[in-house]
C-alpha cells in the first residue's frame, strides 16, 4: 500500500490562499520560520519567512495565478499551476516539503517553456529585487 506525505491540507490551504490574493497573515501561519524557496527568479534561494512572503506577494500582485491540481507523494506534495502576465504565460509546479509541524519548510518552483519562463522572470524581477534575465540563442 502506498503511503502519502502528511498534511496535504496545508498545501491545499496554500493554494486557496494564493487564489485569494496571497494574504500575508494567512501565509505566515503555514510557512516555517526558516523556509527556503528555490525558484526561477534567481540563481540563489530565498531563505526565511519574510523573504519568501515578500516574493510570493510580489508575484501574486502582478500575475494571474491559477492552480490546477495538488499531487501528493510519499515525502512531498506538488501543486501544478498556470501563471500569466499580459501575453506571457508559463505552466509550473511547486514542489513542497513540509516540516514535522505541517508547515512549509521548502519549496522548489519550476516553469516551462523556457522562452516564456525567461520572459516571465523579466516581468517579475524588478518586483522582487532580482536581476532580469535575457535568453540568448546560438545561431550558426
Q: What is the role of each PLM region?
A:
Residues 1-140:
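C-terminal and inter-domain tail/linker signature
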